[in-house]
């Protein structure tokens, strides 16, 4: 699905970092280093970005037209 706007635990804004994070990780950078560079320090926010699975393209095939 879509990345949540805020961290579930602390409420910090994380959605603005998602595109930069995923682009750099797909380019081969270390995810921990990328999170450090983006300023994501709290482990709750880090797990939000590290554990997110983007499945919107798979789920959209199962929606019914309104």
UniProtKB/Swiss-Prot annotation:
HAMAP family: RNApol_arch_Rpo10
The protein's assembly and partners: Part of the 13-subunit RNA polymerase complex.
The protein's name: DNA-directed RNA polymerase subunit Rpo10
Enzyme class: transferase
Binding note for cofactor: Binds 1 zinc ion.
Disulfide bonds: none
Organism: Saccharolobus solfataricus (strain ATCC 35092 / DSM 1617 / JCM 11322 / P2) (Sulfolobus solfataricus)
UniProt keyword annotation of Magnesium present: no
Job of this protein: DNA-dependent RNA polymerase (RNAP) catalyzes the transcription of DNA into RNA using the four ribonucleoside triphosphates as substrates.
UniProt-annotated location(s): Cytoplasm
């Amino acid at each position: 699905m879509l990345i949540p706007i805020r961290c579930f635990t602390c409420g910090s804004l994380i959605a603005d970092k998602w595109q930069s994070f995923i682009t750099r990780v797909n380019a081969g950078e270390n995810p921990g280093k990328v999170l450090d560079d983006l300023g994501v320090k709290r482990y709750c926010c880090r797990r939000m970005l590290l554990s997110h699975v983007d499945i919107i393209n798979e789920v959209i095939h199962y929606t019914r037209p309104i």
